[in-house]
């Protein structure tokens, strides 16, 4: 039955055979299109048509990610063996050399030898060696951070997107899907693009989560691996508020015992861990790092990706949507099918009268419709090809965008790491320089102490020499006294011999007295005439007393000399040990300073090597990125140019991409302008700071110059005063010389008197011997007197018997002869006694005269000693004044050293500001950078010339002071008595110390010149580095890093 329009129902249209011999696919697609022309989008027929295609696409896409997930699981959970090649965090290649537990942290660890020197050790940690490798190529990591293949950017999501697009193309060519309305083509295409970009971004974020540090992510969970303070790694065990402080805190169990607690603070436990492994830190100081061993964030992200892919594959027939868009683009310029049918129906109604003509016209129209349907199928196939090509191009563009973003992120991350390394090296360099300065100060202090100890040692040596000289003099005097004692002993022995001879003579006299009685009366008369024996002389007692005093004084001097010698020997030993200790410490500190210098040099070389490596890597990344962009342009230019419409659509797409790129470039340019403005402000601020520092430095230099001039004038006045004092000392020294001559004359007189005293003592000894002999002779005279009385009695008896006995006349004559002889001997003895008395009186008179002379000389000696004491006091005062002048000169040299150190410190701060200015100038545009560089060079030359002039002036002043000091020292040497070696040694030590101070000041001036030259070389090097950095386009990450540091 026919409709009122005269056409057959659409259900029978499928019975016509294809006149061109189309395949079944074309007929099926035509029947579907014919059936959908009269039905709506939400009809059951439409749902049946779209259902199989979507389910098939979903099945195709959902079956693909299975092997990929299994492969990734094997990479993370597979068993690693020693010698296997792996990648640490997916970016650092190396070979496994150790698997197992370690002593520095609990759990399982993997030791890897990296290909590049970007590690942390040489296989040994904490003094324990686990494997052997070169320095900075060994690293210890968790096995969960190792992969058997390098991690590529956006690998998983790109695979899903490619598979989904493949499924769409298959469904498009199969023709099983029904296209929806044309009004949904543009937003669905945008959704496809957004989904592809989103998956690319998710893949990039997944890579960054697995292989690098996420800076802005503060969503921390229990079990996440984090980095605390930029140096300490660990696992999150607690997140929330605490009792010991306000705000959000994060409790971390560290990998190494570098913490402060065991999870409990102030009696409250927040988590459990070993001691020294727990650490609490604010959340803003904690950064989450990749490969969390127990973190659920990875599972959530993979689940979210899987849901995104499944949603994309299960969406209502994305292939049919693309086919509908192509149909809409091809049918938009020609009449629709419904209009064509109405036209044929109107023609058929006008010619209804002729059935034959109508049937022919109907056949023609039917053929025309079939021809149009065939053309429509061909165009649809071509549009499907074009859309697939566009999808591929969009996919490639998305991949290139993701790769570009990944390259930019990696470059920024590497640059940030390089900056952190440079900053750490700078800090270490500053710390090492500070330590070097401290060690240098310590060494200078030790040198000063060693010099002082050497000076004191010289003084002690001079004192010991003086004491030795005194000991020698005392020994000589002792030898003289011993010689005198021996001489006195010999004289005593001689006197004893003389007394023995006298005794023999007395015995002979007794025999003669017994023989001759006649001499008894004469001897008695002589004895009566001789007076009583004289008393003992006081001169002998005085001489004995003086001798005892001399002996006691010699003993005391000997005892004091021995005590002083022992004391000074002990002090000399102690000072020698202290000097040895100081010398050993000085050598030790010198060795430590040399080691620190070597470490600083090694750190600087390693820093430069790392900077060169990072620059080469950045250059290679930039060249690879440029090559990829050129390849993309080549592929876009070399596409198929069969039809004008496809080229137009591609051009429109490219124009849209160009517009997006222009918008991004505009945003980047605005951002760059903002950063350049900020850098300009920073540069202005740095210039102002530099100008202020320069003004301050100029003021300080002027102040130091004035202070130096004042000190120089003060030193000149002090030197003038010292010269006046030296003149006074010269005059006093002349007086001392005159007094010394007088003292020497008095000493000679005293020696002469001592000799006379010794002679008088000898004579007194002789006198004593004579007195003893006289006493003995008196005793003998007494005995003779008794005998004489006996003889007188006998004579009286003889006289009474004279008359009776005449026979005895002859005997009496004999007795008279004997008495005559006895009288003669007694007279001889009396003469001898008179002579001895005269000699004794003469000797006593001489002793009195000598005593008077000795007392006068003693008075003169006392007055001379008083003068000598006063002159010695004056000499000590002059020496103290000279020592004060030398101390002032030493203090002036110390102030010069301090001023030179201050100059070095100010120059160091000025160089730091200049480095900051150079870094700021490096990011400025070309002409402005050149202009600032020229200005900086000119300022640098001016400052360098000023520093050289200052150094030259300081050297001239130092040489002038050295000359004045040498003149004053020469004058001082001319004024001082050459016979005083301690003063000469002391002044020589002072001269050596002042020369050392001047030499140190000159060395420091040379060091300042070397620093100026080194800073000039550093400025040239930084300029070349800034030129290379600006040529490679690295300044934008530097600015971003600076802004992050400011925030």
From Swiss-Prot:
Tissue specificity: Expressed in the brain, and very low levels in kidneys.
Keyword Cytoplasm: yes
Organism: Mus musculus (Mouse)
Ranges where the CAP-Gly domain occurs: 100-142, 240-282
Subunit details: Interacts with CLASP1 and CLASP2. Binds preferentially to tyrosinated microtubules, and only marginally to detyrosinated microtubules.
GO annotation, cellular component aspect: cytoplasm; microtubule cytoskeleton; microtubule plus-end
Coiled coil spans: 355-525, 564-637, 677-1017
Biased composition (Basic and acidic residues): 1036-1047
InterPro entries named in the record: CAP-Gly_dom_sf, CAP-Gly_domain
SMART domains named in the record: CAP_GLY
Function: Seems to link microtubules to dendritic lamellar body (DLB), a membranous organelle predominantly present in bulbous dendritic appendages of neurons linked by dendrodendritic gap junctions. May operate in the control of brain-specific organelle translocations.
Polar residues compositional bias, start-end: 196-211, 1022-1033
Renumbered residue ranges of the record's region Disordered: 1-71, 144-164, 196-216, 314-340, 1022-1047
Keywords assigned: Coiled coil, Cytoplasm, Cytoskeleton, Microtubule, Phosphoprotein, Repeat
Keyword presence, Repeat: yes
An MF annotation (GO) of this entry: microtubule plus-end binding
Protein name as it appears in the record: CAP-Gly domain-containing linker protein 2
Gene3D superfamilies found in the cross-reference section: CAP Gly-rich-like domain
Biased composition (Low complexity): 17-39, 49-62, 315-339
Cross-referenced Pfam families: CAP_GLY
Record PTM Phosphoserine, positions in chain: 50, 203, 208, 212, 315, 924, 974, 980
Compartment list: Cytoplasm; Cytoplasm, Cytoskeleton
Superkingdom of the source species: Eukaryota
